[in-house]
């Protein structure tokens, strides 16, 4: 059963489901379940979601929502994104009490990773 007034499921579109799945499996350890050739769902034990096959992508420039993940070691997460084939779309920058970077995954969806500012 879902919790009231909390995000329960998030759904993305992805042109290359296999590449997107592999990217997030290796980056965050998500577990996936395929539902045919055009849909795969994921869970990380706290939140669930899915990817449907489509040519559209979500970026800030296109007015898409920005999903922001947390990682305690920001530089390590950034390097992992690069190593797994992601592209850095905004390098590490500071904001009040934190730092973050933006990236696109293999299907072009833009996301971000943030961490506390170690100098704050």
Write out the residue ranges for each language-model feature.
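Conserved active-site tyrosine of GNAT-family acetyltransferases
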Residues: 20-24, 81, 108
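N-terminal beta-strand motif that seeds the catalytic metal site of vicinal oxygen chelate
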Residues: 1-21, 48, 65-67, 115-120
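N-terminal first-folded block
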Residues: 6-42
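Vicinal oxygen chelate
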Residues: 1-3, 7-14, 58-120
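Short linear motifs in intrinsically disordered
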Residues: 28-33, 69-72, 90-93
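Conserved short beta-strand elements that form part of the metal-binding/catalytic scaffold
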Residues: 30-63, 103, 110-116
């Amino acid at each position: 059963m879902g919790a009231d007034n909390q995000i329960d499921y998030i759904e993305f579109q992805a042109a290359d489901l296999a590449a997107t799945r592999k990217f997030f499996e290796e980056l965050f350890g998500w577990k996936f379940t395929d539902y045919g050739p055009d849909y795969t769902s994921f869970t990380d034990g706290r939140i669930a979601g899915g990817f449907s096959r489509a040519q559209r992508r979500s970026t800030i420039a296109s007015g898409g929502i920005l999903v922001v993940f947390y990682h305690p070691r920001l530089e390590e997460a950034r390097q992992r994104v690069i190593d797994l084939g992601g592209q850095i779309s905004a390098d590490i920058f500071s904001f009040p009490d934190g730092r973050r970077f933006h990236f696109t995954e293999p299907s072009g969806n833009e996301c971000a990773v943030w961490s506390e500012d170690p100098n704050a």
